[in-house]
């Protein structure tokens, strides 16, 4: 078994072992569950077990699992995005509630384990929440898929002390804009889906 898959499996098993019976009912699903193929990035219930319903120790176990599937820069980006809801809450004067106790809530990220980690059959996991959607599917010795994956940022930039901006997706945003502005003629027409961006 590759070190990458072995580490991911060990960390998934440690997380599952930490769950109470009630947590298991939320976090564990069969690999064939249709919920495994659904993804979105809105600040809503993504299904599974939320950070709000876990202990601090379990938060660490989830983040350890997430880090097993990402580079250091990838994990740092996910961690930065997960903290943006505090900044967004401040920008909105702490008034958005979405008919729940706290509208912008950095604890509303959800983990789901599909199937049985370490078995010979397919298994996988998903982390979803505001502007984060990560999916991994595994069988035996290899990762079958790590898509769909989505990283977003709201706000895209925010001021820090000194002449600095906090931009979790800076290099990706800048590269995308550079690519787009390099296009012209029919290439530009093909690339431009709509002149009006989506609401979110």
Region spans (language model):
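Acidic/His-rich structured neighborhood in mature extracellular/periplasmic domains
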Residues: 2, 34-200
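N-terminal module-boundary/linker segments of secreted carbohydrate-active enzymes
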Residues: 1-18
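Short, mixed-charge, low-aromatic patches
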Residues: 16-21, 131-133
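N-terminal regions that are enriched for targeting/export leaders
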Residues: 18-30
